[in-house]
Amino acid sequence: MEKKIIKINDKDYVLEMTRNSIKWLEASGFSIDEFYKKPLTYFDLIWTSLFIANNKDVAQNPNLALKLIETYEKEGKKPAEIVKFGIEQYKAFMNALADIDLNLDEKIEIVE
């Protein structure tokens, strides 16, 4: 998965969508199919999930990510671009899970 580094209040934050951040997202109720039904809620969840893997402060206190989004916006930057990156990374992860290369010659035994 790709990483993105952003600067907020002169501090660098490494953003990344990982297996654990996706688990956190899903445990928080996120569903990509529902994104347009709850755009603000899911916008915040995706933003927060990107911080979880590499930023211990946010992992321990997800509400900190919401303060960071406000600051990022006040600095004239566009949080929507970061959320778009998060959605792309989420979809890439899901596509990778679905793209399992099965050896067609392999015999599979079903045991009941």
Describe the function of each predicted region:
Residues 13-15:
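Short, isolated positions in well-ordered beta-strands
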Residues 40:
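Acidic/histidine-rich catalytic cores and adjacent linkers
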Residues 43-53, 84, 88:
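Short, hydrophobic/amphipathic alpha-helical patches that form generic packing surfaces
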Residues 1-8, 22-23, 27-37, 57-112:
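Charged interaction scaffolds used for protein-protein
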Residues 18:
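Residue-level signal for threonine
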